[in-house]
Amino acid sequence: MSQSADETPIEQVAPTPENIRQDAKVNFPVFLGSSVGILAIALWALISPTSAAEVLGVAVGAISKWFGWFYIALAAIILVFVFFLGFSRYGETRLGPPNSRPEFSTFSWASMLFAAGIGTDILFFSVAGPVSQYLHPPVGKGETVQAAREATVWTLFHYGITGWGMYALMGMALGYFAYRRKKPLSVRSALYPIFGDKLNGPLGHTVDGAAILGTIFGVATTLGIGVVQLNVGLEILFGIDQGIPAQVGLVILAVAMATASATTGIHKGIRFLSQLNVVLALFLAAWVFITGRTDFLLNAIVMNIGDFVWSFPRRALETFAYNDVSAWMSAWTLFFWAWWVAWASFVGMFLARISRGRTLREFVVGTMLIPFSYVLMWVAIFGNAAIDLIRSGDNSFAEATLKTPEMGFYLLLQQCPAAVFIMGLATFVGLLFYVTSADSGALIMANLSSFLPTVRSDAPGWLRIFWAGVTGLLTIGMLIVGGIPALQNATIIMGCLLYTSDA
């Protein structure tokens, strides 16, 4: 792919992070405070899983009852504000000096942008989400034509532009203050207009520590869902039993791969894995699309787009005040919004890190449209294919997916030609999704717990290895507590704390 004059790679115009990493120093107040807190939670989950599960359940119930409206309203407000910044006169402002240009080619930027914010979970929810909404919608009767139309759109909504608006707001704020105001590329810089130089002390350390807590729970949730999903693939392909031993092994393998990638920096490992991930994932989706009922899927995709656009304003502010669907809200909309918030510090900082030289308008359009275009394609293909399979009379697929959601994706792939090859490819793609999330998360958490001499600097390699390992330990702890539901509950709690503090 050729590059335009304003897309010269950073390697040609500036020192790489690897050349200046030796100047980075550990921020011990942030490092010790966040690591001790996370390790304490992980050990609590490992030592007393029953107690941890009970506390998580009670806390989530209270949050759903008293703060659900706040989640919904603030998410909508953030989205409107982001579009205003991007398409107003402020949209011409660059994330960098006025004469700066993008550091990465458009393809590299788009690949990293989408891979950092989308994880293995999209394999899980692209089938489990639509199937669940079709069989048991929040309101109305399931297994109807209306339920089929609503099912995929609900999943698109939960993975849609509302969440990316949270990422974009954080990324714009961090990028602006780092590149235009010469502040550190850390979460504390986003609060500089409010607190000023007070952020240079304990207050700033607390903000960055909270960002690390949110990041690690968000990433651990994605990784936990990922290893459960991958365990299914390994059982089908190689007969490896599902369970904690296999999942622990997958966590260790993925953390090792993520560590190797993260220690090479953005310009090498992370960029390469992101690009490879995009290509293989697109091939996988294209295979299902071409070998399946292509005519039906084309019609369904167009219909999904129309339904999504038409119903978006209603869904964005939907609290179901007149319906008793608190359990559904906790499991779906509130969980997803908390999940996006938990990831916002990490992804926003990462987006700012790779977006130097782009205008706010480019940034908003890119972050809102590029990942969602992929999500739309992926969810529409796999979600509609799954619903079509159920409506064609395959009740066993419906029952299995509802009972064991992580099975749904692979059961759908078993219907495709060359099923063994495609399931093997899907497992590898899932592993790459896992690694690109984990390596980016380890890099950002290491940077948040360091004093960096420049915005292009990265933390010492050992610190990235530490955070990759702690993320794996927390993932294992939450899986032992209760698997995916425990991870979801922990994310809702951390998301609520971050939501409230950010507001």
What are these regions (language model features)?
Residues 15-21, 54-60, 88-106, 131-153, ...:
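Flexible loop linkers connecting adjacent transmembrane helices
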Residues 78, 82-85, 95-185, 365, ...:
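Membrane-interface helix-loop-helix modules in multi-pass membrane proteins
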Residues 22-25, 29, 33-46, 79-82, ...:
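Helix-loop-helix module between adjacent transmembrane segments
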Residues 18-23, 49-63, 82-103, 153-157, ...:
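Membrane-water interface regions at transmembrane-helix termini and the short interhelical loops
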Residues 180-185, 214-231, 345-364, 420-449:
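Membrane-helix boundary/coupling elements in multi-pass transport proteins
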Residues 125-137, 288-311, 319, 372-404:
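Extracellular/periplasmic helix-exit of transmembrane alpha-helices
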Residues 499-503:
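Conserved small/polar residues in nucleotide/adenosyl-binding loops
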Residues 23-38, 196-205, 240-259, 263, ...:
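Loop-to-transmembrane helix boundary motifs in multi-pass membrane proteins
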